[in-house]
Amino acid sequence: GGDLEIGADVFTGNCAACHAGGANSVEPLKTLNKEDVTKYLDGGLSIEAITSQVRNGKGAMPAWSDRLDDEEIDGVVAYVFKNINEGW
């Protein structure tokens, strides 16, 4: 798993503009809560599916693979997965 401290920093610096507190400011129905992620994310709620979404983007969400390194992506995925499962 990724480093949660790195993940928290990456989330705050890159993701929170749209996803603060697990929300989605661009597409309000597609939040980062467990029910929505399970329903809307390609592949459902899994580390692999979240990693793919972060790396490749989809819809309004940009791909981050050219801006974040593997350690940063693994960290932010671990951070998001933990928070989804704990209800932010």
UniProtKB/Swiss-Prot annotation:
Gene Ontology molecular function: electron transfer activity; heme binding; iron ion binding
Subcellular location field: Plastid, Chloroplast thylakoid lumen
SUPFAM superfamilies: Cytochrome c (SSF46626)
Keywords: Chloroplast, Electron transport, Heme, Iron, Metal-binding, Photosynthesis, Plastid, Thylakoid, Transport
Cellular component annotations (GO), alphabetically ordered: chloroplast thylakoid lumen
Keyword Transport: yes
Primary localization class, coarse: plastid
Signal peptide: none
PTM summary: Binds 1 heme c group covalently per subunit.
GO biological process, one term: photosynthesis
UniProt-annotated binding residues for heme c: 15, 18-19, 61
Pfam families in the record: Cytochrome_CBB3
Recorded superkingdom: Eukaryota
Subunit structure: Monomer.
Family from the record: Belongs to the cytochrome c family. PetJ subfamily.
Functional summary from the UniProt entry: Functions as an electron carrier between membrane-bound cytochrome b6-f and photosystem I in oxygenic photosynthesis.
UniProt-recorded name of the protein: Cytochrome c6
